[in-house]
Amino acid sequence: PQLHMPSRRQRQMFIRDRSDSMHVATFQFQNSFIDETIDSIGFRIRGNTSRGSAKKSFKVDFNHFIRGRNFYNLEKLNLNGEHNDPSIVRSKLCWDFYQDIGMKSSRASHVTLYVNNEYFGLYLSVEHIDDTFISKNFDNDNGNLWKCIWPADLTFRGQYPEDYHPYYSETRPYDLKTNRDLYDYSKLARLIRIIHNTPDSLEAVLDIKTTLQYLAMNILTGSWDDYRFLRNNFYLYHNPDNDLIHWIPYDYDNTFGIDWFDID
């Protein structure tokens, strides 16, 4: 894709690379089938440790400034620089594996990125996990979706839902992404309570198949920045139709022998 924005805004974005503030930009996408331009999209730097890298990753938000708008059924798009992977194929292989086994996961493809006519490099375009993703992958999209990042260890903290609300000012281990007006953590609290008190009852609240697929895939790909090792990088979705929580994979740059300190 091509992104165009005022040069002053671009400089501000790179100076304040830890900010999640969206900047107005024009998005142009062209391939063998599509040649479209969208004005007034949101554009910002994204990521955690990757924000400190020379090759930044970016988030595109098609409806941030103009509500209700999407681009081929996508409201948001992650453009990942894969800064510590010289091959830029590790994450793509992981997402392809998940697609091959039929697990609900992000779609991904390689793209070239230009910002203000400057070539930024080869990137991996990864589908954002949000309410749009849920509506495409589940018959019932009215459930709660949690983004789980460090320290999302599923440790028992108490019997009440509010015990699992974000508990550090800078840390949100279980970040509710849908139905925020209700702020209901009861299904998450129920899952954690059963994990620690009556694990023989897990099948009644957790989709065991997708959980085992997730764990097996992380072992296969050598993913260590995950729930199993770092209590990090996964989503949980409660499906009201079957009253089960489903595991959704997330973030696969640290796989196949890659660590934080590799090539930038």
Q: What is each stretch, according to the model?
A:
Residues 1-11, 15:
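Single conserved hydrophobic/aromatic residue that forms the stacking wall/gate
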Residues 12, 16-89, 93:
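Conserved NTP-binding catalytic cores of kinases and kinase-like/nucleotidyltransferase enzymes
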Residues 15, 115-116:
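Structural motif
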Residues 59-67, 81-82, 101-106, 118-221:
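Internal "kinase-insert"/substrate-recognition segments embedded within catalytic cores
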Residues 258-264:
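Hydrophobic, secondary-structure "cap" segments at the distal end of domains
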